[in-house]
Amino acid sequence: MSFKDLRSFIDHLEKNGELKRISYPVDPHLEMTEIADRVLRSGGPALLFENPTNHTMPVLVNLFGTPKRVAMALGKDDPLALREVGELLAFLKEPEPPTGFKDAIAKIPMYKQALNMPPKTVRNPPCQQVVKTGDEVDLTSLPIQHCWPGDVAPLVTWGLTITKGPRQKRQNLGIYRQQLLSKNKLIMRWLDHRGGALDFKDFKQLHPGERYPVVVALGSDPVTILGAVTPVPDSMSEYAFAGLLRGERTEVCKAISCDLEVPATSEIILEGYIDPEETAVEGPYGDHTGYYNETDSFPVFTVTHITHRKDAIYHSTYTGRPPDEPAMLGVALNEVFVPILRKQYPEIIDFYLPPEGCSYRMAVISIRKQYPGHAKRVMMGAWSFLRQFMYTKFIVVVDDDVNCRDWQDVIWAITTRMDPIRDTMMVDNTPIDYLDFASPVAGLGSKMGLDATNKWPGETTREWGTPIVMDEKTKQRIDQIWDDLGIQDMPTL
């Protein structure tokens, strides 16, 4: 099942008990965050606040608040089915010619999906049913959440920022938080390595002093939103990838003020520009780390046009100490990463990003070990293979007899198969999340790899221990007589 717009997905969630409408008046200032946080931590539904205080536009939160809803957005029933998305990405990252007739037949579904890649331009799009320009532009009329007591101002959180670099054929979609400055200005917080910032940098080099056109889409269809947070190959547009996931082309339309293409069924579109000479201090804001971040200067986005659907819905979220919505997205996208990593490193059995690790700061990898030093090779490969993992501070590698998603198993492996000096690899002066205030320098810090695998000759000269396992004959015998023993069922430790 695919969803043409956000509204059809909302209807689907509501029919399946995954969305709750809140008619009671709730304030976007702090109150929505507290309610959403309580509901998310209990595994509850998405919430549609129909009567936000001092506003007429409904607010949608916790849309991707469980891995199940992320899977539902992509037409899947189970988060594990998201590995199919990873298999598609692995195919796109390293497309190989068929090795024979049978291989060609097997790859036909992939080639069919590729035909859905180019976006489809439509006229009279829903996102331009209402057009506001000049003095009509008023960002304060939107029910923008003020999430935490220490936040400096309301914050746009789920906007898809659309840019195009002068050296790129494709447009880029990225999600960058945006601080409300005034009725027509936001601060665009994009970090230097992100696609939008790189496009802007290239534009300034080729067009010094000129205004850079930017568009922000709010409330796009769920597949396009998820396409913007998935590790799409740099050469591919997120629109094209969304078409692959959806099984049909992404509908776009031309923005009113520039040539950028926007998702046609979006709820709200903000059009405008960035003046290369205009910056402002952003923050502080509570972030996904569970702390307020430092302030820093970023470009100012001046909004010249607001277009939206009739009876538009404002899509929002908050970030805080995990679990939050980004952490739940990370749990779901974890399944996407597994096939991509296996494509490059077939010895990988499983890969896990624990949500407590702020989505990506810690990873645990289980491998089928084949030679001394193998774990360290996998660590270095993971850090360098995908852009998402350059911020991963800690990687633990375990053997295939250890469940990398079970902390009891992982801690047992660390404490019994590791020597702290021999099996710890430290790498300094590496890229680190700018929000990580624990690093010595903003954006630059160290990484730690922990080899918790069994050690091979060459890694140790000692006789290595053999895990204790009861023989199958005895276990079967006890299974047979268990009920006769009169021992009540006991809780699992």
Curated annotation (Swiss-Prot):
PANTHER family: 3-OCTAPRENYL-4-HYDROXYBENZOATE CARBOXY-LYASE-RELATED, FERULIC ACID DECARBOXYLASE 1. It is a peripheral membrane protein. It comes from Shewanella frigidimarina (strain NCIMB 400). The keyword Manganese applies. Mn(2+) binds at N172, E238. Catalyzes the decarboxylation of 3-octaprenyl-4-hydroxy benzoate to 2-octaprenylphenol, an intermediate step in ubiquinone biosynthesis. Transmembrane segments: none annotated. It catalyses: a 4-hydroxy-3-(all-trans-polyprenyl)benzoate + H(+) = a 2-(all-trans-polyprenyl)phenol + CO2. Its cofactor is prenylated FMN; Mn(2+). Binds 1 prenylated FMN per subunit. The lineage of its organism: Bacteria, Pseudomonadati, Pseudomonadota, Gammaproteobacteria, Alteromonadales. One of its GO terms (biological process) is ubiquinone biosynthetic process. The active site is at D287. This is 3-octaprenyl-4-hydroxybenzoate carboxy-lyase. Its EC number is 4.1.1.98. Its main location: membrane. It comes from the Bacteria. Keywords: Cell membrane, Decarboxylase, Flavoprotein, FMN, Lyase, Manganese, Membrane, Metal-binding, Ubiquinone biosynthesis. Coiled coil: none annotated. Pathway: Cofactor biosynthesis; ubiquinone biosynthesis. One of its GO terms (cellular component) is plasma membrane. One of its GO terms (molecular function) is 3-octaprenyl-4-hydroxybenzoate carboxy-lyase activity.
